[in-house]
C-alpha cells in the first residue's frame, strides 16, 4: 500500500521525504538508547515548563519515542499513509503538512494537557486524516487479507485514542 490509487490497490513504494523522516526517527531513537533517555528527553522533548528555555522542543519532540512499539507504530503509519500524500502534494507541501500537524499537536497539548510530550503521533494522526479525506473508499488490507475502506483506520485510531484519553493511558 503506498503510491498508486487505482482500484487495484497500492503498490509498496517509499518516497523521498517519508524515507528521510523514517531514518531521522530511527536515528534519534538509537541516539536516545546510546546517550540515555533522561538526557534526550530533558533536552529535546517538549516540556511546557521549559518552552522559553528550550524552544526547539516544539519540533524535536517529534523525533523522540517512548519505546520500540511507539516508534514501530508511528513508522508503520508513516510508511503506509505518507507516500500517497507525498506523491499527491509533492515533497515540500507534504513536509509542511507533516510539521504543521506536529506543531498543532504540541499546541493542543500545551493548552489542554500540559505535560512532557514525545513522539510523532500528532503528525501521524494528521497523515491518517488526510489520507482518509483524499481516499476514503480505497481498500486497505489489514494483515494483507481483510479489506477495509481507507477512512476506517483513521476512525478506529481516533476512537481508540479518545478511549485511552478517558482512561488516562496516554
Residue spans for each PLM region:
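A detector for small-residue-rich transmembrane helices and their helix-helix packing motifs
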Residues: 1-170
